[in-house]
């Protein structure tokens, strides 16, 4: 199992990155908060990883901290939650917000995330309550927040920052009209793509 990578960041296009480790390029997918903490391209970086083997693919998921990876691993053990949905959840709300949803039985907030229906949200609330409590107690004081991102194909009259933001929202499962509307409403002159993605995602939760 590949548990950690240390190398040079070659490419990054949310939520995917490419890291060169001694001449071998590793492709990873990351939740947005981890993605935003990466250095600039061609700089050294270290990420913790979770390796998934499927019949049709071998996938690596990357995280800046072990805590993020632990939460991801708890999520994919829940019924109806695979790696893709777990990544979307971790990209869509902070760790404290997710714990808060579980503690409050807040189905309304959870179902706003793409791919999370009512039944899935109900299962998460039941299955994650005790598991999350243990995880958060083990990491008091070191809690990191997660940000939501998705991918969407660009609308014809948007600038590059808006195109990147829409594309990111689409990758998380938002519909093109949702992504376009959220990005357009959140955009302010001079915003870079990362700031715009965060603002657009926040407006949809």
Swiss-Prot record:
The keyword Oxidoreductase does not apply. Keywords: Cytoplasm, DNA damage, DNA recombination, DNA repair, DNA-binding. Residues 157-205 are annotated as: Domain III. It is found in: Cytoplasm. It comes from the Bacteria. Coiled coil: none annotated. One of its GO terms (cellular component) is Holliday junction helicase complex. InterPro entries: DNA_helicase_Holl-junc_RuvA_I, Hlx-hairpin-Hlx_DNA-bd_motif, NA-bd_OB-fold, RuvA, RuvA_2-like, RuvA_C, RuvA_C_sf. Residues 65-143 are annotated as: Domain II. Residues 1-64 are annotated as: Domain I. Pfam families: HHH_5, RuvA_C, RuvA_N. Residues 144-156 are annotated as: Flexible linker. NCBIfam families: ruvA (TIGR00084). Belongs to the RuvA family. Has three domains with a flexible linker between the domains II and III and assumes an 'L' shape. Domain III is highly mobile and contacts RuvB. This is Holliday junction branch migration complex subunit RuvA. It comes from Shewanella sp. (strain MR-4).
